[in-house]
């Protein structure tokens, strides 16, 4: 049983267990009340950066908040697809769930890195620590995925040619 699980699958499942509920709640708070959700603790650095450096109107700020929520929900969707793929043994053994995990890690890393840069620009140390921690978790799982060996295909059993008799029909391709 333990031979079926890859270390990147376990690491990805643990990362998904954190990001799916956390980023879903943050995104739904933004969807319900865009401005109020944007100025909550996980997004305060993005909100302050947008208001200080961009000088956007109210509706443009709402659109930026929705764009952030859409990005986070996209990461959540890829993590959910990854977890669904993990339930199937064929995908898990062959490493087929790696594409969904790679997409979630790459998009999530970009969002966390941008949020971390914005937090450093506006001087939010708590938000900086949060986004740096999220980025390190995502990059750690990405490094595990990159350094892990590819999945080895199961050996195929070949039948001996002596089983063929003269009474068995032969295909036209076997001439």
Identify what each model region corresponds to.
Residues 2-3, 78-106:
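Cytoplasmic juxtamembrane regions at transmembrane-helix boundaries
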Residues 5-36:
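N-terminal signal-anchor transmembrane alpha helix
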Residues 19-29, 75-82, 108-115, 141:
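Helical transmembrane-bundle signal
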Residues 28-39, 82-95, 118-121:
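Juxtamembrane transmembrane-helix termini
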Residues 11-19, 68, 101-111:
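Hydrophobic alpha-helical transmembrane segments of polytopic
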Residues 58-75:
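Individual transmembrane alpha-helix segments
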Residues 32-60:
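Membrane-interface interhelical connector segments
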Residues 107-175:
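Alpha-helical transmembrane segments of multi-pass integral membrane proteins
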